């Protein structure tokens, strides 16, 4: 089933776990701080009884959803064919601070690598192989992407601005795109 750390969890470390066939979120945290997730494997989820309004959780919901947190690091993890991989900051108004993703491998993932809303995010040295929408910035998210490697990915960067949600931005430095695309 996976698990969620809720409200005021602090100094959490999750490591060396493998998540498969989860119907909802595999590993999530809400309103917590100092969260370190590393050396984990996230395989495709499975929900045979998706009765939600969204009707898109047949492959599970988020592998790693982090909402309203501060000081989150996700490192040395492997994501295999996950659908909604990682949502950071799920609100239009609640600011989340200081998220870092480094040395992760995204293999054949569909979207949210991660999707960020109201987040300051630093990403470096991640590898994306045959993925869909990768870094997706919305609602005042600020992303620094350094030395990422994208291979065979269809949309490496996506920025969605809205007058009601604020302007997001992605700054990419040293990223390499091989047989990959991005939307301006």
Annotated model-derived regions:
Residues 26-30, 35, 157, 162:
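Helix-rich interaction surfaces within compact, conserved domain-sized segments
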Residues 166-167, 182-184:
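Outer-membrane beta-barrel pore domains
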Residues 1-28, 182-183:
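N-terminal carbohydrate-binding/catalytic regions of secreted carbohydrate-active enzymes
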Residues 10-21, 33-53, 62-63, 68-90, ...:
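Right-handed parallel beta-helix
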Residues 139:
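A short beta-strand motif that forms part of the nucleic acid-binding face
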């Amino acid at each position: 089933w996976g698990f969620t750390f809720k409200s005021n969890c602090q100094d959490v470390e999750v490591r060396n776990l493998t998540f498969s066939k989860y119907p909802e979120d595999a590993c999530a945290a809400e309103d917590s701080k100092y969260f370190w997730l590393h050396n984990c494997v996230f395989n495709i989820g499975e929900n045979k009884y998706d009765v939600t309004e969204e009707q898109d959780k047949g492959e599970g919901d988020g592998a790693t959803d982090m909402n309203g947190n501060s000081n989150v690091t996700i490192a040395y993890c492997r994501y295999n064919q996950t659908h909604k991989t990682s949502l950071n900051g799920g609100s239009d108004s609640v600011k989340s601070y200081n998220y870092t993703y480094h040395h992760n491998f995204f293999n054949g993932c569909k979207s949210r690598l991660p999707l960020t809303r109201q987040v300051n995010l630093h990403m470096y040295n991640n590898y994306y192989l045959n993925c869909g929408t990768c870094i997706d910035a919305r609602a005042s998210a600020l992303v620094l992407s350094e030395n990422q490697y994208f291979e065979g990915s269809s949309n490496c960067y996506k920025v969605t601005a809205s007058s009601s949600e604020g302007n997001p931005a992605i700054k990419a430095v040293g990223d390499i795109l091989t047989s990959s695309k991005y939307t301006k």
